[in-house]
Amino acid sequence: MTLQHTRRIVKSLFILFIIVVCIYLLPRVAINAFYYPDNKVYGPTPAEAESITFTAKDGTHLHGWFIPTAFGRPENAVATVIHVHGNAGNMSAHWPLVSWLPERNVNLFMFDYRGFGESEGTPSQEGLLDDTKSAIDYVRHRADVNPERLVLLGQSLGGNNVLAAVGHCVGCANMRYADQAGIRAIILDSTFLSYSSIANQMIPGSGYLLDDRYSADRNIASVSPIPVLILHGTADHVIPWQDSEKLYALAREPKQKIFIPDGDHIDAFSGRYANLYRDAMIKFIQTALSAK
């Protein structure tokens, strides 16, 4: 074998190595572009909040708040809402959007994913799913919570995590079956269809790099018979409202959709609309709870 031939072989192997590394790393780099965590404090901790540290299934320590109903004992509340936020900020930034819930005789549990706020770790698809499942399990086992009256509220990216946590991936080689015990209703606010669809909107063709097993479109049908409420503003500048229209078509009954004229991203429960969509959410929860 000549030296020139040897060099060609080494060069070919090196190129092959680079290709393999890129195939392995590019999807991880692409998905990490979805997460914008920070530990900035956007406002004071609610006076009535119990600061919680709980542990994800892989041992990561996570931070949360439990805010009890403003009316009587927590175990007698209408329901306990588990809030699952989006891909940026932390729960202190999202608190103003859900601060009204305890005044509706509802307990509220908020938490930060790994890498967000005071939670340890680094964000990843698998990690955020673990965190969401662990938050549900934590609330389910609190002594002062009725474990049969749980409601999941997922906003933006949080909707994908909610659906992946309590559903299974349709069409995936290894289906994930999840524990739906006590989950009586799911609310999705400004949720995107899939990771790949959002990536393709930003960079055409880049969606092929992403793992869609945890995407809303793969999981929404399998959460049935849990009732699903879908909300989305028609002027959302982050996630196209048509994503929610497609998710509604994929969802099974019972389901309900509310499209907010000129509504922006996750502002259904802001003060912009007074109590209009807040009342709609509470009515949906009450109807779901009375179903069985």
Swiss-Prot record:
GO terms for cellular component: membrane. Its main location: membrane. It is a single-pass membrane protein. Keywords: Membrane, Transmembrane, Transmembrane helix. The chain crosses the membrane at residues 13-35. Gene3D superfamilies: alpha/beta hydrolase (3.40.50.1820). It is found in: Membrane. Belongs to the serine esterase family. This is Uncharacterized protein YfhR. The lineage of its organism: Bacteria, Pseudomonadati, Pseudomonadota, Gammaproteobacteria, Enterobacterales. The gene is yfhR.
